[in-house]
Regions:
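An N-terminally biased module of ancient metal coordination in phosphate/nucleic-acid-related enzymes
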Residues: 80
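His/Asp/Glu-rich metal-coordinating catalytic cores
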Residues: 1-11, 15-77, 86-163, 174
Length: 174
């Protein structure tokens, strides 16, 4: 198992972690950054009208093959820890054929929050796979167990235990 932390080690927000093996690739969160380069507050409206290629060049999105719309999907699943935009805010750019593993409450809240955002900023999860507390599931080579806890919003997952079948490999805590 290999791990790439694309964003989230030196700042709060904008979390994006990639875990992969020879056969399986998963993404843990794909959040909107809270700060722009230079330290100013990130302005979501700065994304409007830009292509995926432009956003990769600006380091808002990451060059992850097979993750985005218009590409051949090469990612087996996306795990969303909770419904804060710094954990899910860039989902709208991702290929809609890739399953999104998320708690029921978080999925519903993201849908409801679209009422309060500009239409171009709406997040739609077309392939939601609802996860439940301590109900393990497999994505390719990985065995995953979500742990839901109280947070500042409903059905937050604070830990995903990700193991390579059959050996335990690591824990993700957003």
């Amino acid at each position: 198992m290999q791990l790439i932390i694309h964003r989230g080690t030196h700042q709060i927000g904008g979390t994006c972690i990639e875990i992969y093996s020879r056969k399986t690739r998963i993404i843990l969160d794909y959040g909107m950054p809270l700060t722009a380069p230079g330290g100013k507050e990130f302005d979501e409206t700065s994304l409007r009208g830009k292509t995926i290629t432009e956003l990769i060049k600006e380091h808002v999105l990451f060059a992850i093959p097979g993750l985005y719309k218009g590409q051949d999907p090469q990612v087996n699943g996306i795990l969303i820890s909770h419904s804060h935009k710094d954990h899910y805010g860039l989902l709208k750019y991702l290929h809609t054929d890739i399953p999104v593993y998320i708690s029921e409450g978080a999925c519903k809240l993201i849908h409801v929050l679209n009422v309060f955002t500009h239409k171009q900023s709406h997040i739609s999860i077309s392939k939601a796979c609802i996860v439940k507390h301590k109900a393990s599931f497999d994505i390719g080579d990985f065995h995953i167990t979500p742990y839901l806890v109280d947070h500042s919003n409903t059905n937050a997952i604070t830990n995903f235990t990700v193991t390579v079948i059959p050996a335990k490999a690591g824990i993700y805590r957003p």
